[in-house]
Amino acid sequence: MSKQTLVLLYGGRSAEREVSVLSAESVMRAVNYDKFLVKTYFITQMGQFIKTQQFSEKPSESERLMTNETIELTQKIKPSDIYEEGAVVFPVLHGPMGEDGSIQGFLEVLRMPYIGTNVMSSSIAMDKITTKRVLESIGIPQVAYTVYIDGQDLEACLVETLARLTFPIFVKPANMGSSVGISKAQTKVELRKAIQLALTYDSRVLIEQGVVAREIEVGLLGNDKVKSTLPGEVIKDVDFYDYQAKYVDNKITMAIPADVDQSIVTEMRSYAEVAFKALGGCGLSRCDFFLTQDGQVYLNELNTMPGFTQWSMYPLLWENMGLAYPDLIEVLVTLAQEMFDQRESHLI
């Protein structure tokens, strides 16, 4: 039986490229090599496409994907050279230029099926401010927030923020994930510095009310018919679940399933599915919630390309539901092909 080609794109231009490499290495080991041939392409920080490795069987645990230290620029290709008829692309890319609709649009121009949400839902979900406004329109509860756009009057923003929110306050670049560029502010001075830090990553800044809450996550999978997982909980050994804690210091553990009341489970799964559909989601996403001590649920964000590392919540949530990592990849490939066929059928 001939194998189907699965194209892995990894690296990328955003500050989250290191997470992308870790995720892609986990995917390449989880693939069922009886069914798939894996071809990998590294995207440099400058946006160059580099042809790297090809795997017809499961690589050893010591095998690493080629990155900046090991690639040869002679391997550079035109981006369109990734095209292969019948192949499905897994863009294991996080953050801007990865899950913001950019690469999705490129793959649609190439007429290649790809895993994940489409151009519209990717771009909406990538921008935390736009996501909040969409979710507000359908009545999904979220923490209070204000917005700062580069070029606006910063002093006026500080006045508005301090009138509406109380410390602690969290400041986030609107278009970043993996906790990159996020700060916790306890004073007006810290708030100003946090906004300035966020502006180094994005011109749009989300300023949110801090809440004392558990962090609960729900996995989503599907196109027209969406399935959700039982929730999992991120248990932190640090005050603030930042990039360092997530991917470097390993100062988190996960409880899957989360120990929460059944009514809360039902509420979160419902909110997650409704939010996914409201954003036009397809393929997959992870929906992140805050759960306060008094039982209030707040939807924090939808992540359209969640981490796929060996310690990432998303594949572990599905494993808990009885869907093993290799089988999850196969389902994602099938969903990608379904969406491709649907898009093609709408072109007259």
UniProtKB/Swiss-Prot annotation:
Residues that hold Mg(2+) 1 according to the record? 288, 301
Report the cofactors: Mg(2+); Mn(2+)
Q: Where in this chain does the record put each ATP-grasp domain?
A: 132-334
* Single Gene Ontology BP annotation: regulation of cell shape
Pfam families from the xrefs? Dala_Dala_lig_C, Dala_Dala_lig_N
InterPro entries in the record? ATP-grasp (IPR011761), ATP_grasp_subdomain_1 (IPR013815), D-Ala_lig_Van_CS (IPR000291), D_ala_D_ala (IPR005905), Dala_Dala_lig_C (IPR011095), Dala_Dala_lig_N (IPR011127), PreATP-grasp_dom_sf (IPR016185)
Q: What is its main location?
A: cytoplasm
Q: Where in the cell is it found?
A: Cytoplasm
Reaction(s) catalysed by this chain, per the record, are: 2 D-alanine + ATP = D-alanyl-D-alanine + ADP + phosphate + H(+)
Q: What is its EC number?
A: 6.3.2.4
Give the cofactor note text.
Answer: Binds 2 magnesium or manganese ions per subunit.
Primary enzyme class: ligase
One of the record's GO molecular function terms: ATP binding
Q: Where does ATP bind?
A: 162-217
Query: Can you say what this protein is called?
Result: D-alanine--D-alanine ligase
Q: Which taxonomic lineage does the organism of this UniProt entry have?
A: Bacteria, Bacillati, Bacillota, Bacilli, Lactobacillales
Q: Which gene encodes it?
A: ddl
